[in-house]
Amino acid sequence: KEEWEGYLQETLTHQDVVRSLCDTLGLDPNTQSPTRRVVKHIGESLVKAMQLAKQGGDPAAAQLVACECVVHAETKDHANWELLGKVAEVATGDLGRALKAAHEAVEKDEDHHLYHTKGWCRELAIEALGLPAVLPPPEEVKNVETAIGASRAEQQRERML
């Protein structure tokens, strides 16, 4: 829970980065597009799923549902920032500089969020199945920041039991 609360604070900072980027690019960050409404709906649905799980009275199950919801959100968030990074690689001039600055400000946090959250979710699911889990997960212990690092950490989990 503490891990995800920290991610929330960083995500709010990332939101500020996007709003600033919109301002720099002359875009209204408050414009409601059809796709933005869908994203909002998905986010609200994930929150509702967590609330429903919490009401079920099983704290371990609620924690696992919350973890799965966070993985869904972080996976999409990571993909969006990765896409912004791809555009930043080819953009030039003021646009390129603005995109690169925004991406560089957020990329490391997004990598951390995704790989660590996936590790927590995997280990909590393993624990829920009654199997030995590595808690905190290897990704956390080894403080991985890349996909390769996350893969290596996961491969080492058996030795950490």
Located regions from the model:
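Amphipathic alpha-helical hairpins
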Residues: 1-161
